[in-house]
UniProtKB/Swiss-Prot annotation:
The keyword Cell membrane does not apply. GO terms for molecular function: ATP binding; single-stranded DNA binding. The lineage of its organism: Bacteria, Bacillati, Bacillota, Clostridia, Eubacteriales. This is DNA replication and repair protein RecF. One of its GO terms (biological process) is double-strand break repair. GO terms for cellular component: cytoplasm. Keywords: ATP-binding, Cytoplasm, DNA damage, DNA repair, DNA replication, DNA-binding, Nucleotide-binding, SOS response. It is found in: Cytoplasm. The gene is recF. SUPFAM superfamilies: P-loop containing nucleoside triphosphate hydrolases. Its main location: cytoplasm. The RecF protein is involved in DNA metabolism; it is required for DNA replication and normal SOS inducibility. RecF binds preferentially to single-stranded, linear DNA. It also seems to bind ATP. Disulfide bonds: none annotated. ATP binds at G30, N31, N32, A33, Q34, G35, K36, T37. Gene3D superfamilies: P-loop containing nucleotide triphosphate hydrolases (3.40.50.300), RecF/RecN/SMC, N-terminal domain (1.20.1050.90).
Length: 363
């Protein structure tokens, strides 16, 4: 699977551009703030129907326009795909696949998988549990529409429970019990799927991390949850909701459940978030991203497109070399301010595009 070409109209700082991509490596070079990341953002948007940088779609529209348009032509077996997205200033969007309008955004998932690696991904290792949950939810949703449905249902019911907890004069124990039962049903399925995904991440990640560090480090991912057992997760989750009820009423929110869970990342048995060096933290993210590629390939039988947004400059030479030597068979788009030493690691089949204030020239 690879992107054949991309057309943008009034997207971010682009008036109207069309780019034909190499099926192997494409390098987008230019000074900062010229629009390199905007191209990757538009491609990411075609995968999940959302930006990796903002929750406000109106920010994607050129400042003096009312709508933006993205068209991405994809070579994909057994049938090529044309993804077209209109983004409106009022907040709505329209998505078509091969000229057929999608009824819901989840229908887009799995059509076109990408793995994005940007400096912000360090948050997966360094910052709060919410970033790690977001990573899990996004990666699993790409591969399983049912997971996304259950996640949406869980969050809707959670919101209803929290509203009732905060409005004590409307507190209804019978209704809380109904919410607890529904949350246990959907929540247990989320936990099971996350644990399965982390098992795969461990399986792939251990080999990748050992390769990157030349056998000096071992990485391990462990799911962290209030649920102790693994046999009757739904029943245990229901008990946890019941046991936390008084505390939840006092605080006005739900204190247990998959929306509070986390996963640890350990390097040689030491927590990478608290005690890992910056180099170890960067390597952990690199491991996670390349393991994600392998998981997508294993489950979907298709290789995702890899988007590297200004990350090579953040890595030392050995890690740069690992990435650039691992691109065989993966269409890759790389943004950077200059080619520098990248070229010596790449085979001849790559394209270079110069980005200058929303204008693109191939050379």
């Amino acid at each position: 699977m690879y992107i054949k070409n991309l057309y943008l109209d009034n997207f971010r700082n682009y008036d109207n551009i069309e780019i034909d991509f190499n099926k192997k490596v494409n390098i987008l070079t230019g000074n900062n703030a010229q629009g390199k990341t905007n191209i990757l953002e538009s491609i990411f948007y075609c995968s999940l129907g959302k930006s990796h940088r903002t929750n406000k779609d109106k920010e994607l529209i050129k400042w003096d326009k009312d709508e933006a348009f993205i068209r991405l032509n994809l070579s994909r077996k057994p049938l090529d795909k044309k993804i077209e997205i209109k983004i409106f200033k009022g907040g709505k969007k329209g998505i078509n696949i091969n000229s057929i309008k999608l009824k819901k955004i989840s229908e887009l998932f799995g059509i076109f998988n990408v793995v994005m690696f940007s400096p912000e991904d360090l948050k997966i290792v360094k910052e709060s549990p919410g970033h790690r949950r977001k990573f899990l939810d996004m990666e699993i949703s790409k591969l399983d529409h049912r997971y996304y449905y259950k996640l949406v249902q869980y969050n809707k019911i959670l919101d209803q429970r929290n509203i009732m907890l905060r409005n004590k004069k409307f507190l209804n124990n019978d209704m809380i019990s109904v919410y607890d039962e529904q949350l246990s049903k959907f929540g247990s399925s989320l936990i099971e799927s996350r644990i399965k995904y982390l098992n795969k991440l461990n399986e792939k990640g251990k080999i990748i991390h050992s390769d990157i560090t030349k056998g000096k480090e071992e990485i391990e991912f462990t799911y962290l949850t209030h649920v102790k057992g693994r046999e009757n997760i739904s029943e245990e989750l229901f008990s946890l909701f019941k046991d936390s009820y008084k505390r939840d009423v006092e605080k006005g929110n739900t204190s247990v459940g998959p929306h509070r869970d986390d996963f640890s990342i350990k390097i040689n048995g030491i927590d990478a978030r608290s005690f890992g060096s910056q180099g170890q933290q960067r390597t952990s993210v690199l491991t996670i991203k390349f393991a994600s590629i392998q998981i997508i390939k294993e489950i979907s039988s298709e290789t995702p497109v890899l988007l590297l947004d200004d990350v090579l400059s953040e890595l030392d030479e050995s890690r740069q070399e690992y990435i650039l030597n691992s691109l065989e068979g993966i269409q890759t788009l790389i943004t950077c301010t200059g080619i520098g030493d990248i070229e010596k690691y790449l085979k001849n089949d790559f394209n270079v595009f110069r980005i200058d204030n929303g204008r693109i020239a191939e050379y």
